[in-house]
């Protein structure tokens, strides 16, 4: 397992509860840029729409050798999870006070994976 990027801010700002491993749908120039380590998870978050999971605001730098077919750096990317996992996350989010944050991006074999965690925000007052 080769770790590409970690979200250390999430460990500081949230109490992390449950961990899920999700595949991520990437374009050709995105995966080439990820292999070079040009990923930032700092301000990214996970959103669930119509029983599909998306990661938003995750920055993958444009590939240096990509021409007009290069990708948009902060586009919305679909995450690949089992239906049971999506339903479990959705039910816990409906209880309130929880969110889902990406904490780590890594390669499992040749596939890029994103570790997402169910989290509760910390109070600083």
Task: List each language-model region with its residue ranges.
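Residue-level signature for short turns and capping positions that connect secondary-structure elements
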Residues: 21, 31, 46, 60-61, ...
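Beta-rich strand-turn-strand
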Residues: 80-117, 121-123
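Helix-adjacent hinge/juxtasegments
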Residues: 49-89
């Amino acid at each position: 397992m080769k770790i590409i990027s970690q979200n250390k801010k999430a460990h500081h700002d949230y109490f992390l509860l449950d961990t899920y491993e999700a595949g991520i749908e990437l374009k050709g120039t995105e995966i080439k840029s990820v292999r070079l380590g040009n990923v930032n998870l700092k301000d990214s978050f996970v959103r669930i729409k119509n029983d599909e999971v998306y990661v938003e605001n995750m920055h993958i730098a444009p590939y240096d050798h990509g021409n007009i077919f290069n990708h948009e750096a902060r586009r919305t990317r679909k995450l690949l999870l089992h239906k049971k996992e999506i339903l479990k996350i959705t039910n816990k989010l409906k209880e309130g006070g929880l969110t889902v944050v990406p904490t780590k991006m890594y390669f499992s074999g040749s596939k890029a994976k994103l570790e997402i965690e169910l989290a509760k925000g910390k109070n600083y007052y």
